[in-house]
Amino acid sequence: MLVKRHSGTIIFDTKSQSPKAIFTVNHDKKGPLPSGTYTLWFENEQSLRAKIKLAQKYNLKGLGSWSLGQEDASVWNTVFKNI
């Protein structure tokens, strides 16, 4: 995993109800990313539950996702249990 390779940390942002990973790429590490500090936002079961609750609270007609197929299969269990 990219975050582990660069000794990053994963935290859950309570304001956005989403996890994020923060990691730094140094010049001495090989890879496609240029040197710098990166913040990577993603979804997990906890963040999906929060978003589903929000959609239900406001009676929204559905949910959307970007780039289906990159998620962990367990994510769908969370979606189906909560909709």
From Swiss-Prot:
SUPFAM superfamilies per record: (Trans)glycosidases (SSF51445)
InterPro entries, per database record: Glyco_hydro18_cat, Glycoside_hydrolase_SF
GO biological process, one term: carbohydrate metabolic process
Domain spans labelled GH18: 1-83
Transmembrane annotation, as ranges: none
Coiled-coil spans in chain: none
Gene3D superfamilies given in the database record: Glycosidases (3.20.20.80)
UniProt record similarity statement: Belongs to the glycosyl hydrolase 18 family.
The protein's name: Probably inactive glycosylase YkzR
